[in-house]
Amino acid sequence: MAKKVEKLVKLQIPAGKATPAPPVGPALGQAGINIMGFTKEFNARTADQAGMIIPVVISVYEDKSFTFITKTPPAAVLLKKAAGVEKGSGTPNKTKVATVTRAQVQEIAETKMPDLNAASLEAAMRMIEGTARSMGFTVTD
């Protein structure tokens, strides 16, 4: 018989840098997960993606065992890295802070494709372009 999922915990943690300190420790402690076991396994799985923020969904079962799924980094993080800026614009409709090319948008869309609710690469690119515009980025050909 399959184990019953008791709780789902969603976190965004820098790749390879999960520690028992807040915010990771308290979130996992409340769910009753072995914090050291999770941090070691997460860091091992994400060591190759250093510098990125990785969303993770942790399924906690009734017997306090757990499994987790790592997702692709958020589109905003990938866009900031591609544009080489620290943060988006405070007023995206007035102040444009950076420019990204369609090729960069396509690359990001291909990376994000497994996690996006898009039927085609074109649809995924439109989603990423929308995120870029809302951050105050200009998309150029």
Swiss-Prot record:
Xref: Gene3D superfamilies: Ribosomal protein L11, C-terminal domain (1.10.10.250), Ribosomal protein L11/L12, N-terminal domain (3.30.1550.10)
One term of GO molecular function: large ribosomal subunit rRNA binding
UniProt keyword Ubl conjugation present: no
HAMAP family for the chain: Ribosomal_uL11 (MF_00736)
Biological role: Forms part of the ribosomal stalk which helps the ribosome interact with GTP-bound translation factors.
Subunit: Part of the ribosomal stalk of the 50S ribosomal subunit. Interacts with L10 and the large rRNA to form the base of the stalk. L10 forms an elongated spine to which L12 dimers bind in a sequential fashion forming a multimeric L10(L12)X complex.
Lineage, uppermost ranks: Bacteria, Bacillati, Bacillota, Bacilli, Lactobacillales
GO cellular component, one term: cytosolic large ribosomal subunit
Name the UniProt record assigns to this protein: Large ribosomal subunit protein uL11
Family, per entry: Belongs to the universal ribosomal protein uL11 family.
Keywords for this protein: Methylation, Ribonucleoprotein, Ribosomal protein, RNA-binding, rRNA-binding
Matching PANTHER family: 60S RIBOSOMAL PROTEIN L12 (PTHR11661), LARGE RIBOSOMAL SUBUNIT PROTEIN UL11M (PTHR11661:SF1)
InterPro entries: Ribosomal_uL11 (IPR000911), Ribosomal_uL11_bac-typ (IPR006519), Ribosomal_uL11_C (IPR020783), Ribosomal_uL11_C_sf (IPR036769), Ribosomal_uL11_CS (IPR020785), Ribosomal_uL11_N (IPR020784), Ribosomal_uL11_N_sf (IPR036796)
Changes after translation: One or more lysine residues are methylated.
UniProt GO BP: translation
